[in-house]
């Protein structure tokens, strides 16, 4: 299934269970792309769309296939079994843990344990889709505020992407890594989401 096909399923669920209107949607990584698509397609209405340091990659299909095929054999066992089997990957992870304090461990814990029900094809589809996000530019929906949790440590190019895809994003800068706010500071993350939904941000 494609991103638009999956978005249609989300829209149908919101139509059926919420009358086509929701207060807010949050997504990080690929989930942020879904939030953007929900806003852009205008088939449902949300008051707030919140993206958690999504990268909004738009790689060419060929490059995305190559990256997916290269990384999937390393990443899929982590998703399926909840642990790293590759010695090389384990070594790199240990190095990153020592360099970055609790972030790497918290991020791994946020991913959760083993998911034996996730198929390799599903993982491949998600990884590939995350690399070829089909988002239009300057998304601007009356009555919808787009908020972005911008982790400054992921790089300045991401601010340009956010401003490319959204006409008036409210960017919340944090001197953090990708999804570090959610992984390491969940209380701060929850308070920020609450403040946004109460119109305080």
Can you say where each PLM-predicted feature lies in the sequence?
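Gly/Ala-rich beta-loop-alpha elbow adjacent to hydrolase catalytic centers
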Residues: 26-35
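Flexible "cap/lid" loop of the alpha/beta hydrolase fold
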Residues: 40, 48-78
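Conserved alpha/beta-hydrolase catalytic His-Asp/Glu region
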Residues: 60, 82-139
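Conserved serine/cysteine hydrolase catalytic core
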Residues: 121-164, 181
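Catalytic histidine neighborhood in serine/cysteine hydrolases
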Residues: 166-179
């Amino acid at each position: 299934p494609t991103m638009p096909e999956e978005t249609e399923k989300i829209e149908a669920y919101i139509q059926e269970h919420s009358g086509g209107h929701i207060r807010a949607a949050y997504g990080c990584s690929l989930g942020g792309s879904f939030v953007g698509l929900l806003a852009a397609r205008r088939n449902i209405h949300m008051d707030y769309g919140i993206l958690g340091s999504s990268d909004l990659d738009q790689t060419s299909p060929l490059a995305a296939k190559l990256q997916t095929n290269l990384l999937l054999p390393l990443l899929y066992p982590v998703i399926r079994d909840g642990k790293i089997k590759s010695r090389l990957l384990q070594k790199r992870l240990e190095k990153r843990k020592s360099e970055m304090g609790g972030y790497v461990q918290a991020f791994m814990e946020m991913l959760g344990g083993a998911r034996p029900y996730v198929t390799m094809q599903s993982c491949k589809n998600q990884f590939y889709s995350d690399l070829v996000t089909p988002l239009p530019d300057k998304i601007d929906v009356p009555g919808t505020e787009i908020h972005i949790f911008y982790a400054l440590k992921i790089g300045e190019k991401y601010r340009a992407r956010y401003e490319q895809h959204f006409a008036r994003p409210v960017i919340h800068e944090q001197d953090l890594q990708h999804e570090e706010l959610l992984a390491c500071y969940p209380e701060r993350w929850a308070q920020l989401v609450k403040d946004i939904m109460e119109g305080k941000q």
